[in-house]
Structures are given as C-alpha cells and as structure tokens.
C-alpha cells in the first residue's frame, strides 16, 4: 500500500505548485469596464450578491464547465493561465469574433488555486495549466494589460495605475495543501477516500456515504460551502477590497417572552458556545412575581423562551449577567440583603442560574459606582465599586484588588474597558472640565497604575463610546466637531495615551439606532444604524482607525418595534461557524423574534 501511495505522489506532485510568476487572462471587456466592475469577477458572483442565487464554489465543477463546454452561469471562479502565449491562444479560440480584446496581467496571490495540483488525476483539462481565482480578481491585483487587435498581440504592456504593489508584491498562489479542501468533489466522489484528499476532506465528504448517504451529502455540501466562503471573506479582507453584504437566511421564533425594559436586559453567551441569548426580567401583570426570562439561542438564530425563578434578585445597581467563576457559562450576580453581600446564581451545563454562591460580607460602595469588570489573566468578572476606602474589585471567591484616586470622573463618562490591551478591564473617565482622560490600569501583578492624557475634547454628553477600533484594544471614543468627527484614545504599548480623529460616515446626534459591532470578523468594531424609512440596516466597516464610506445595506424582513441597541433589537454574531455570520435580531411584535442573517464578503 505504501508503494502505491508513493507512486501516486511521484506521478502527481500534489504538494507543490510549479508556477510562482504572473498570470494571464484573455477577456473581451475593456479596462474601463473591468475597473467599473471592481475587477475580473465570475458570472455567479453578481447574481450571488444582487439576486441571492447560489454561487458554485466547486473547483471541480468549474474545471469541467457546463455540459455545453461553456462557463457555468453560477461559476464562482475566474480562469487564468501561466503564460501570455497560452492566453493568446485561448483568446483566439473563444474571442475570435471580437476585432479587439485584452490580455490582463495578474499578480500572484492566494486567491489563485492550481487546478491541476488540487484536482490531481481528476483534473479534466490538465494541458491548460489553469490557475483559478476564487471569487474573482480585484482590479487592484491587475498589473496591466495587453491589446490584441485582429488577432495580433501587441506585447507592449499598459500599466494599471490602481495596481496595489504594497498589497500584492511578494505573494504566491495558494499551496495545494491549503486548497485540497476546496476541490469541490461531489460528496460520494472516490477522491475524498484517497490520498491526498482524504486528509483534507470536509466533514461528511466521502466517509461512510453508503450508510447515511443523505446526511453525509448535506453535511459535505454545507461544510464545503462554509470553508470556501470563510476563505473568500479572508481574501477580501487581505486585499482590502470593498466588501459586500449578503442576506443568507431569515428566521422567525414565536411565543417568545421578552424581558421588561424596566430592568436590566442583555444579550449574553448563555451556553458558552458563541451563540447569544437575550436575558432579563419580567413581572407578572399583577406585580406579584418576578422572573428571569431568556430568549434562548438554539443555534442558527432560532430561539425559545426559558423562565427561571429565584428567591432574591438583589438590588438594581450591581445586577449583571456575567461569567463570575470563569467556566465559560453566564451567571446572574447581584448585591443582596442591606447592600452587604455579593451573591451569584451560577450556571451549570443545561441548568441556568441553579447554584447559589455567596461571596460573603462586603461594602457594596456607592450606587452609581457599581460595575463588573473582567479580571486580567482569567475569564472571571469582578464586582467593582467606589467605597470610603477607595475603589475595590471583588470576585465571587472573595479575592479583592484595590486602588485609590482623588477623582472618580464625570458620571456620564465612566467606562470599564481594556484600553491598554492586556486582557483586563481598566477604569476610564473624563476629569477636570471634561478635558482630560484618566484611567486606572489593571496590572498583571494585581496592582493598579494611573495614566492621564494631555488636553483633549471630551465630546458631546451621551456620545461617548467604548469601541474596539483596533484589533486588540478598546478605544475611548467621543463625537466632536458638529457631530461629524469622532476622536478616540487608547494607551499605547509604552504606557502613554494616543489620541486620533476620524471622519464619521454620517452625522451622529444620539445613541439611538446605532451599534458598534464587528460584523466582518476582523476583530474591529464596525458602525451600523437602523434607517426606519426604508426599514434597513446600514453598516460602514472599520478600516483600522477609520470607517469606510462604502455603505452596506440589509433590507429587513419585518419592522422592529424598538430601536437598535435598545435591548430586543440587536446585531449579534455567531462564533461557532466557519461562515462567520451575523444577524439583525429584533422584536417584531406579538411574541415574535425575527433574525435576518447576513454574511460580509
């Protein structure tokens, strides 16, 4: 058997792509047309985004083409070849009816897959030496073009001034070992049970097909689709092209009991699996009984209601749904008795808020100073507050850290946030005449360090935000200068404040109907707002300390009855799926929770 496998590898050099130079494609469309379209994109690309029709992401199907021999109408790849003469020959065969056509010169990059290497002996046309571009080729990847007039190739290149050498220099096509999972063979194809593809087969592909054929076929198709679309997302992020939003699903969950807006309510990872549920309180119509209610996320943005009764829900200031013991499950914590005990109802797998734990006596501090902050080096949250002895943070195991400061800052400016990126929440607020930002930084040694900015604009009241503008640090941001500019500050690695400004994509006057959230999976918060007139969500992506001017629009399937970010209307992410999707979930009335799921490509 080892001998046979060795022979296969000799006959098919499956782990090495032979070409690392530039690539070529013959096309009838002019450079201006290609530029206006944003690049060389496949036929299925436009219908995928504009009409919602499926795009074929099977490299095997792309290489085979349609039964007529033409390109598939739903094709998700763009063909290229490795030398200009081959491109000229292809052009003469398929574009002979055009007096003039073009051969585009394309820079190597990981969106290009070596068809022969990936498909091996199953490559239908190995003589073509084709490299296929997954999802197409952005205009910024095109180095230039040659003109073919009446069949004669002019070898003088016309340079593309929009070519991004800073992005595409020194890149290479995707390695076969990175691409076998994208081969796109049918679920029952023998390749999935052979070397090398068996080692890269997505779940359900080629394994025990005869035993559970239908399930495996569906699993194989779904897993291949998720892998390819995640790859497409990553490529578009790497190439810094304008991204697109695609609606992928609409769900409607009925008989949902929504939390009462008079109490705390939060979207939380109730099960520790990345799917957010909506939890809060409700009170019987006669006011006789209070309960915790959660719209529990069952997966795929479908929900059902759960109810939990407790003997004591504690005082309003200090109530939170957080992970108190670091086990990944959400607990319910509060201050009980005469503001003297920290109490948490801990969750067990499938048993929410079922195990009560008392941290013992403590000074609960001043009402408006109470907050929960993430403890550095753990997944726990601690209860933090200002007391007569200074600031104290205490966890459910009664471990405390403390610091003193002579200025607790303005009430409408206080945030607990990881402004220095070390994994623990710091206490930040505006001091003096809203002119300086002061933070007490949580250190890994349990000690606290105070830092203060130089003069800055504290911004408009109620328009101050905690935003992850960069991938590893929370930024303290304020709306300033006629509501069109945002200034943000963070603590740099040398321990000093860095303040910068950026233009907003729209004027921002209040917090209603906006939300900062990462919708494209790059660990940076984007900005979204609800527009009531056309009933749409509009988002602008974070481009690292700036927001794109390219507006992404989602048309909602129903009308939300509350404003975005107010509680029952929220954009949420799912983190347990390769497709990296988000959804705008909202109370549509009559006990219905609607979720319009979308993906950013």
Curated annotation (Swiss-Prot):
Q: Which domain of life is it from?
A: Bacteria
- Compartments, record wording: Secreted
Keyword presence, NADP = yes
Instruction: Show the disulfide pairing.
Output: 205-220
Where NAD(+) is bound, by residue?
A: 26-43, 130
Is Phosphoprotein among the key words of this record?
A: no
Q: Record's InterPro entries?
A: Enterotoxin_A, Integrin_alpha_N
Q: What keywords appear on the UniProt entry?
A: Disulfide bond, Enterotoxin, Glycosyltransferase, NAD, NADP, Nucleotide-binding, Nucleotidyltransferase, Secreted, Signal, Toxin, Transferase, Virulence
Show which residues constitute the signal peptide: 1-18
Q: What is its EC number?
A: 2.4.2.31
Q: Which one of the record's GO molecular function terms can you name?
A: NAD+-protein-arginine ADP-ribosyltransferase activity
GO CC aspect terms: extracellular space
Family the UniProt entry places it in? Belongs to the enterotoxin A family.
Q: What is this protein's function? A: A probable mono(ADP-ribosyl)transferase, it may ADP-ribosylate Arg in target protein(s). Upon expression in yeast cells causes cell death.
Q: What additional remark is attached to this entry? A: Toxins are often highly strain specific; not encoded in strain ATCC 39315 / El Tor Inabe N16961.
Protein name as it appears in the record: NAD(+)--arginine ADP-ribosyltransferase Chelt
Taxonomy of origin reads: Bacteria, Pseudomonadati, Pseudomonadota, Gammaproteobacteria, Vibrionales
């Amino acid at each position: 058997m080892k001998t046979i496998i060795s022979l296969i590898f000799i006959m098919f050099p499956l782990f090495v792509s032979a070409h690392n130079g530039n690539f070529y494609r013959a096309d009838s469309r002019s450079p201006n047309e290609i530029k206006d379209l944003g690049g060389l994109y496949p036929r299925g690309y436009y219908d995928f985004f504009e009409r919602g029709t499926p795009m074929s992401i099977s490299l095997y199907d792309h290489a085979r083409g349609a039964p007529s021999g033409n390109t598939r109408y739903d094709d998700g790849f763009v063909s290229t070849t490795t030398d200009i003469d081959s491109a000229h020959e292809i052009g003469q065969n398929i574009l002979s009816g055009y007096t003039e056509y073009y051969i585009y010169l394309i820079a190597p990059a990981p969106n290009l897959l070596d068809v022969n290497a990936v498909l091996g002996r199953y490559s239908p046309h190995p003589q073509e030496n084709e490299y296929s571009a997954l999802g197409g080729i952005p205009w910024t990847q095109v180095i230039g073009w040659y003109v073919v007039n009446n069949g004669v190739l002019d070898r003088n290149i016309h340079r593309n001034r929009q070519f991004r050498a800073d992005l595409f220099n020194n890149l290479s096509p995707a390695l076969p070992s990175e691409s076998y999972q994208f081969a796109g063979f049918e679920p029952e194809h023998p390749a999935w049970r052979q070397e090398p593809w068996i080692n890269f087969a997505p779940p359900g592909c080629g394994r025990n097909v005869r035993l559970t054929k239908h399930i495996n076929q569906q699993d194989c198709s779904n897993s291949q689709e998720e892998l390819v679309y995640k790859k497409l997302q990553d490529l578009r992020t790497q190439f810094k092209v304008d991204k697109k939003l695609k609606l992928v699903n609409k769900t409607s969950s009925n008989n949902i009991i929504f939390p009462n807006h008079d109490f705390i309510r939060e979207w939380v990872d109730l099960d520790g699996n990345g799917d957010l549920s909506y939890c809060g309180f409700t009170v019987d119509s006669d006011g006789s009984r209070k309960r915790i209610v959660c719209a529990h996320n069952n997966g795929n943005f479908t929900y059902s209601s759960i109810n939990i009764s407790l003997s004591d829900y504690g005082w309003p200031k200090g109530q939170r749904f957080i992970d108190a013991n670091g086990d990944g499950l959400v607990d319910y914590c509060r201050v009980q008795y005469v503001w003297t005990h920290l109490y948490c109802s801990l969750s067990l797998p499938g048993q929410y808020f079922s195990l009560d734990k008392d941290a013992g006596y403590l000074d609960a501090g001043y009402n408006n100073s109470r907050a929960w902050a993430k403890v550095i080096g753990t997944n726990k949250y601690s209860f933090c507050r200002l007391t007569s002895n200074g600031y104290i943070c205490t966890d459910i195991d009664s471990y405390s850290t403390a610091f003193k400061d002579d200025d607790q800052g303005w009430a409408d400016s206080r945030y607990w946030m990881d402004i220095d990126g070390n994994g623990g929440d710091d206490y930040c607020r505006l001091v003096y005449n809203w002119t300086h930002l002061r933070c007490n930084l949580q250190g890994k040694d349990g000690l606290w360090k105070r830092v203060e900015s130089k003069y800055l604009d504290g911004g408009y009241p109620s328009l101050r935000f905690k935003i992850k503008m960069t991938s590893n640090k929370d930024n303290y941001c304020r709306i300033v200068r006629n509501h069109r500019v945002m200034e943000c500050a963070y603590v740099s690695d040398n321990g000093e404040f860095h303040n910068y400004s950026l233009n907003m994509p729209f004027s921002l006057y209040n917090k209603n109907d906006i939300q900062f959230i990462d919708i494209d999976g790059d660990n940076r918060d984007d900005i979204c707002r609800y527009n009531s007139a056309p009933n749409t969500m509009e988002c602008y992506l974070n481009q690292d300390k700036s927001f794109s001017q390219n507006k992404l629009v989602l048309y909602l399937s129903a009308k939300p009855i509350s404003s975005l970010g107010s509680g029952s209307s929220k954009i949420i992410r799912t983190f347990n799926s390769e497709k990296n999707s988000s959804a705008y979930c909202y109370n549509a009335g009559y006990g219905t929770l609607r979720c319009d799921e979308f993906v950013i490509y």
